[in-house]
Amino acid sequence: MPSSTRPRVVILGAGFGGLNAAKALAKDADVTVVDRHNFQTFLPLLYQVSTAGLAADHVVHPVRGALRGTGIKFRMGSPISVDHKNKSVKLDSSEVLEFDHLVVALGSSTADFGVPGVTEHGLGMKSVHEALMIRAEVMRRFEDLARFEDDTRLSIAVVGGGPTGVEMAGALAELKRGPLKNDLAHAANHMDIYLIEAGPRILPMFSEKLSARAESDLHKLGVFVKTNTAVREIQSRKIILKEGEPIPAEVTVWAAGV
């Protein structure tokens, strides 16, 4: 197809969806990808960054590297307006990109389901920055715990029993059983890890057999799995439930709605 007659496609977002769409369309169209960052974050491995299993640069990859040799153009910036009549999108750099087709692949943000305190007291799992915040907070709390030689305990709660929450709870348990216990066994033995799920089972999108196996494995790792446990409010050092006693939580990781 001659270049002059190839449709112009602008894709907003350089995540998995945006980049895959760009590569699929590049053969028959002139494609431009727009993202506010010039790197892509491999979200499924953020839990490893949160628990010191991986360095941050292991889950971040340059967008231009992913597009090298494809003929796809890249612009770093954020869209501030779309003119549907004239088929153009304006970026915060003041650049205007014209298109025949516009693909919006901007991803999603964490849903708090209207639960009070999530923003103030919960730590999300959507970016490297958030993953590093979780790591720093867990380690800070562990160092605080290390000062005590009595029965003072540290509780870390993960809210959300989907894949992200299950992986996070398991990784925290491995961190506790491995590096932290090797550094200071007394403190590690006084850490409690909770996985809280509002529904009747964790990993509800998978088979009941797989859910049961995952819950069993978490129990073996020392994770307290709480199903049928709906959260009413997140406070600074505890989680208020819709029913039952509050759950202590010096650190709350919000993996619900991720």
List each model region and its residues.
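Short hydrophobic core segments
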Residues: V10-L12, L97-S108, V231, I239, ...
